[in-house]
């Protein structure tokens, strides 16, 4: 039997009919804050408001619903960093199927609990592997041994067609409001979303520039399409943007992206954190890291989009509240507002007051101070964190720190030391 490896607009139209009474038609909203900030019209496609707070339900339900009754009776499996797993779990409960869902051990607890909530007694969750790719290998082995049906999170034409329904929905909504998009920004993990969206847009909105956005620490599609012209596996990835941190994209999604995507943007994980906080404080939107990628990319494209009409897909809103401290820290580091040093501190009365008076600026704040006094030595090691009001004050701060202790270590520039703090 020949395995289908291409996706057409007809496939997406058929998927749209299957999903019509299953998924929520999420809002397409003109965002006034972003529009003013970038001097253009910025629309947000709010898939963070989907039933499972992610677009992944579209692809999961479509891929499962096309299985034969015999195949469905054998049960389904999947590997996912969270959102695809929720889509599979939701579908398993809806269609009363047995599902075994494999998730990396690094998956935020919030996402694990949501999978269990949506799937209830129909779903068994297995936490395994440090990355999605390790988790995937375990899932495929289990699927083969138990003769079940693996629901691929991105490298499957039915999954891609389901994700593509988002594009059809967007274009129908924009047509009602007489809106034409000049640019579309969407996140790339394994490539299912960008493949489905771009397939539909290239036929029905061919003048729209499709921009794929990846975290800089996991830019597997860019490395495959632009750098190597073949699918490659990244040896190491930053797993912070867990919904888009994939070491290897799909063979099918690679071919579609290569044909349809106009440009790729890599966004620093710290910039993503700043966007998450900005979206929450300015727009009351709770976006997960992968969900904020598309908006983060606007800063890279600000000169191109001025005066244009832009749409950003907010792909998910499953953010674990326990990650907020790390998100704030990464944002402050990226914005050059928070700085850590290791100092040799004099062990004498008044040394701390001297440091505060001589080193800190009038608006600087100490956010961390760890010190263990050793009576047998003249100095003790101090780890100190200093938060600035303006990142332009950093040069003067470093000069004052160097004068206080010429042997100091600036932790921000040492990834290994910094990882011990965050």
From Swiss-Prot:
Q: What is its EC number?
A: 4.3.1.19
Cited Pfam families = PALP, Thr_dehydrat_C
The biological processes this protein is annotated with in GO are: isoleucine biosynthetic process; L-serine catabolic process; threonine catabolic process; threonine metabolic process
For whether the record's keyword set contains Amino-acid biosynthesis, the answer is yes
Q: Which UniProt keywords apply?
A: Amino-acid biosynthesis, Branched-chain amino acid biosynthesis, Isoleucine biosynthesis, Lyase, Pyridoxal phosphate
Reaction(s) catalysed by this chain, per the record, are: L-threonine = 2-oxobutanoate + NH4(+)
Q: In which pathway does it act?
A: Amino-acid biosynthesis; L-isoleucine biosynthesis; 2-oxobutanoate from L-threonine: step 1/1
The segment(s) forming the ACT-like domain are: 339-413
Output the superkingdom of the source species: Bacteria
In this chain, pyridoxal 5'-phosphate is annotated as bound at 83, 189-193, 315
The chain residues annotated with the modification N6-(pyridoxal phosphate)lysine are 56
Q: Give an example GO molecular function.
A: threonine deaminase activity
What InterPro entries does UniProt report for this protein, alphabetically?
ACT-like_dom_sf, IlvA, Ser/Thr_Dehydratase, Ser/Thr_deHydtase_PyrdxlP-BS, TD_ACT-like, TD_ACT-like_sf, TrpB-like_PALP, TrpB-like_PALP_sf
Which cofactors must be present for this protein to function?
A: pyridoxal 5'-phosphate
**Subunit description:** Homotetramer.
The record's family statement is: Belongs to the serine/threonine dehydratase family.
- PANTHER family per record: THREONINE DEHYDRATASE, MITOCHONDRIAL, THREONINE DEHYDRATASE, MITOCHONDRIAL-RELATED
Describe the task this protein carries out: Catalyzes the anaerobic formation of alpha-ketobutyrate and ammonia from threonine in a two-step reaction. The first step involved a dehydration of threonine and a production of enamine intermediates (aminocrotonate), which tautomerizes to its imine form (iminobutyrate). Both intermediates are unstable and short-lived. The second step is the nonenzymatic hydrolysis of the enamine/imine intermediates to form 2-ketobutyrate and free ammonia. In the low water environment of the cell, the second step is accelerated by RidA.
- The protein's name is L-threonine dehydratase biosynthetic IlvA
